[in-house]
Amino acid sequence: MVNLHGATRKRSEVPLDQLLESVWNVRDARWQGKLIRYIPENDGPWFVLADVLGALDYKVKPSHVKKALRTEECRLMEIGVKSALANCVNMTGLLKLLSFSGKPEAPAFLEWAREIEKGTRG
């Protein structure tokens, strides 16, 4: 299943041009030298959860974090040409994750993410 522009569909049901558009929309940004991939959407950026967890030195799998978030806060998205799928989190889910993290870097990361958000909203 692929979540593309807010709709979950079987990969075979998604036209190739839409899949490629999603893949081409993956952006890279750096926070304290660590790569964070995100997908700009109309409702704001969707950050690759594994990148966020890695940047903040979390020792938990993205699939475990996803269970603690609502469906509208975390979804599986296409991020690579070779059919790579990743759990991605929106700003609401990111805020929830960071507010319970206890990580001293959390406020700085959230501020950085809000700057990304400002640049993705039209």
At which residue positions do the language-model features occur?
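Basic, low-complexity intrinsically disordered segments
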Residues: K66-A84
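Positively charged, aromatic-accented nucleic-acid-binding surfaces
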Residues: M1-P62, V81-G122
